[in-house]
Amino acid sequence: MNSKRIIILAGGSGGHVFPGLTIAKHLIKKGWDINWIGTKNKIESEIIPKCNIKIHFIKIQGLRNSSLKNLIMTPINVLNSYLQVRKIIKNWIPDIILGMGGYVSGPGGLAAWSCKIPFILHEQNKIAGITNKLLSKISTKNMQAFSGTLLNAEIVGNPIRKNIIDIPPPIKRFKNRKGPLRILIIGGSQGASIFNKILPKISFFLQEKAIIWHQSGNNDLQKTRKKYKKYSTYKHIVSSFIKNIAEAYEWADIIISRSGALTVSEITVVGLGAIFIPYPHKDKQQYLNAEDLENNGAAKIIEQSMFTAELIIKILNSLNREKLFIMAKKAYSLGIRNSTSKISKIIHDVSNKI
């Protein structure tokens, strides 16, 4: 019996690539053949080949901050990208195509539709971008991580890596935990400059009450370490990048972070109280990702315009481990821990209807 074939469309950022990769690894174990479509010089070009998954690169660019010349050229560029994907589809003939986001999803979804290949769409964020809103009208099946994002879409959560799902729940982690509060600070895989400027100061005010583990990103590593030394001799760790994020989540009592879709989903799967400082997108994408957690008492949201060390200190001083345990349990109650198997089943069911 021949293996079923799937093309995964995902690129540009870890928020699209890592959920797609989690699905890919799950399907490979079930005997599927995987091809990936992405772009060169983006995160997928480094990660996907290392996983022994065949990747095709297409030329495409987004519209953000584009010049007038690029805007004029957009229809031609989209057509060229569409033709590139269509050629890949015709040469390999997949049973199904999965769109996980990024610039490749637009031409990829159109090519799937024109070739009459079942196309299923997954939206990671609470609010969909214009591309996914349009693609959702021609897709075979729509999936969403959060409720109310797309019409007629099934809520499946975001695919989370197994080592994160396997972290013990809050009731086990917090049992008999003593000592200073453990504060994890993450501004995304590349860090966040505003976090690196503002948050070292909290160590001075919290003193021996807290241990801080701060992911700074590579560019600001030395500057951030100097700031901590300036403000405090109390225990802290500054890392450019935390390779084992599951270890960090398991260690922490609370996280201070952006609220990208994958981060929010991971926090609910783990069960961890949070202070979110959403990236100030015009469409409030990250704010909306975190809103359900705040409404359910699992997190606090501070808009970047209001973000100060003093406000963070005030919030942290109002919390103790007992309160953080309650926040963690509330976060845990919102988690979807079987997202990967849900999506896998949808892929299997849709492909069998051909």
Curated annotation (Swiss-Prot):
GO molecular function, one term: UDP-N-acetyl-D-glucosamine:N-acetylmuramoyl-L-alanyl-D-glutamyl-meso-2,6-diaminopimelyl-D-alanyl-D-alanine-diphosphoundecaprenol 4-beta-N-acetylglucosaminlytransferase activity
Keywords for the protein's UniProt record, in alphabetical order: Cell cycle, Cell division, Cell inner membrane, Cell membrane, Cell shape, Cell wall biogenesis/degradation, Glycosyltransferase, Membrane, Peptidoglycan synthesis, Transferase
Localization in the cell: Cell inner membrane
Membrane topology (UniProt): Peripheral membrane protein
Main location: membrane
Pathway involvement of the protein, from the record: Cell wall biogenesis; peptidoglycan biosynthesis
Binding site for UDP-N-acetyl-alpha-D-glucosamine: 13-15, 125, 161, 189, 242, 261-266, 286
InterPro entries: GlcNAc_MurG (IPR006009), Glyco_trans_28_C (IPR007235), GlycoTrans_28_N (IPR004276)
The reaction(s) this protein catalyses: di-trans,octa-cis-undecaprenyl diphospho-N-acetyl-alpha-D-muramoyl-L-alanyl-D-glutamyl-meso-2,6-diaminopimeloyl-D-alanyl-D-alanine + UDP-N-acetyl-alpha-D-glucosamine = di-trans,octa-cis-undecaprenyl diphospho-[N-acetyl-alpha-D-glucosaminyl-(1->4)]-N-acetyl-alpha-D-muramoyl-L-alanyl-D-glutamyl-meso-2,6-diaminopimeloyl-D-alanyl-D-alanine + UDP + H(+)
One GO term (biological process): carbohydrate metabolic process
Gene3D superfamilies given in the database record: Glycogen Phosphorylase B
Signal peptide: none
Transmembrane segments: none
Enzyme Commission no: 2.4.1.227
One GO location term (cellular component): plasma membrane
Family in the record: Belongs to the glycosyltransferase 28 family. MurG subfamily.
HAMAP family tied to this protein: MurG
Function of the protein: Cell wall formation. Catalyzes the transfer of a GlcNAc subunit on undecaprenyl-pyrophosphoryl-MurNAc-pentapeptide (lipid intermediate I) to form undecaprenyl-pyrophosphoryl-MurNAc-(pentapeptide)GlcNAc (lipid intermediate II).
Record-given protein name: UDP-N-acetylglucosamine--N-acetylmuramyl-(pentapeptide) pyrophosphoryl-undecaprenol N-acetylglucosamine transferase
Protein species of origin: Buchnera aphidicola subsp. Schizaphis graminum (strain Sg)
Gene assigned in the entry: murG
